[in-house]
């Protein structure tokens, strides 16, 4: 049933052109976002899902903490799975995968997967607003 609905939806087909993003992730993202125009910028989607770091500032102390975990935890988990799949299983080369693998060397796998998940959310929102398909090269904004 879900697969049949996704095949009929142009938006789902558009999002599923991203390596690592399947039917469940695409439909869940569309259902959670509802209307892409609700966000002023695509960058705001990462914060809305809870994939950006919390900031602590007091006096001379200023550091970024863990992710905020705001928003839809189910969608956050699906984006993390898509990022994990992109980094580990997808063999198609893309700028996003290359960027994620470089981050993995420097930060470790989990932090790199969170960063790629946030970037995926931003790219998915941009794709929904513009209607352009995923480009493996120059996908990083």
Spans of model-derived segments:
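A detector of single, family-specific signature residues
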Residues: 1-141
